[in-house]
Amino acid sequence: MATYEQVKDVPNHPDVYLIDVRRKEELQQTGFIPASINIPLDELDKALNLDGSAFKNKYGRSKPEKQSPIIFTCRSGNRVLEAEKIAKSQGYSNVVIYKGSWNEWAQKEGL
């Protein structure tokens, strides 16, 4: 499980993927954690099956390798559990969740 401090440090670790699985409308309402990429939960399974160039075109970042460090975040820490299952079922082995997710981030950042 990732902590607030680890998530805050993600911009200093370009090899880490911070994936926000909330819907785009939610991000427009609340904002997002810096360095995160948005892949809504209902797109995640398909997204992780895209080839590398299609993934980069759609999400603006190279596709994670199976061993790449991935941290999932959402609003309250529930959807990340499903995201973790999806990624692990596709062979991603270095996956953790940020249980505090947006709610904790916003509180600690004073947003």
Swiss-Prot record:
Alphabetized Gene3D superfamilies for the sequence: Rhodanese-like domain (3.40.250.10)
UniProt keyword annotation of Ribosomal protein present: no
Disulfide bonding pattern of the chain: none
Pfam families per UniProt: Rhodanese
Alphabetized UniProt keyword annotations: Stress response
Domain of life: Eukaryota
Domain named Rhodanese: residues: 12-110
InterPro entries reported for this sequence: Rhodanese-like_dom (IPR001763), Rhodanese-like_dom_sf (IPR036873)
PANTHER family referenced in this protein's UniProt entry, alphabetically: THIOSULFATE SULFURTRANSFERASE RDL2, MITOCHONDRIAL-RELATED, THIOSULFATE SULFURTRANSFERASE_RHODANESE-LIKE DOMAIN-CONTAINING PROTEIN 3
Descriptive protein name: Rhodanese domain-containing protein CG4456
Species: Drosophila melanogaster
